[in-house]
């Protein structure tokens, strides 16, 4: 992102949820780079989750440092949170901690988490119904919601 800015790139950078990071946002800060990401969570989507994560970050200096020095919530944080609970549901459905049994149970797991509804197809790939398009507000060092798209 910094290289793009220094070279005067005039076309937008489009990225996936892995670019939905406060570290990437920091790299774009103060530049004229247009940076868009498609992602699975927008801060404010679950106020209770946001409040809990921000409280934890602000109470733990190491967590704050690991989060880039601020309490911006990246989609991967919310996705990791939901993944933990999905894994618990898969363990319950399997009735076992055997990896093969858990994998076999996964297609039957559905879960409504902070990132929305989560289900799985017959080979275990996640089926998601919501995507957020965010744009880097480089003047204010924040992500701004551009649009939300829901399937179905």
Language-model regions, residue ranges each:
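Extracellular/periplasmic periplasmic-binding protein-like sensory domains
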Residues: 3-81, 135-151
């Amino acid at each position: 992102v910094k290289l793009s800015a220094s070279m005067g790139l005039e076309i937008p950078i489009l990225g996936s949820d892995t670019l939905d990071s406060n570290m990437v946002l920091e790299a774009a800060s103060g530049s004229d780079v247009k940076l868009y990401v498609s992602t699975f969570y927008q801060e404010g989507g679950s106020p209770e989750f946001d409040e809990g994560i921000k409280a934890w970050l602000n109470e733990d200096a190491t967590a704050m440092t690991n989060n880039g020095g601020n309490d911006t919530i990246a989609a991967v944080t919310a996705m990791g949170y939901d993944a933990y609970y999905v894994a618990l549901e898969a363990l319950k459905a399997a009735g076992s901690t055997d990896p093969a049994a858990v994998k076999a149970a996964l297609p039957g797991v559905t879960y409504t988490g902070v990132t929305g509804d989560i289900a799985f197809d017959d080979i275990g790939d996640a089926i998601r119904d919501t995507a957020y398009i965010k744009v880097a507000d480089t003047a204010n060092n924040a992500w701004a919601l551009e649009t939300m798209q829901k399937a179905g």
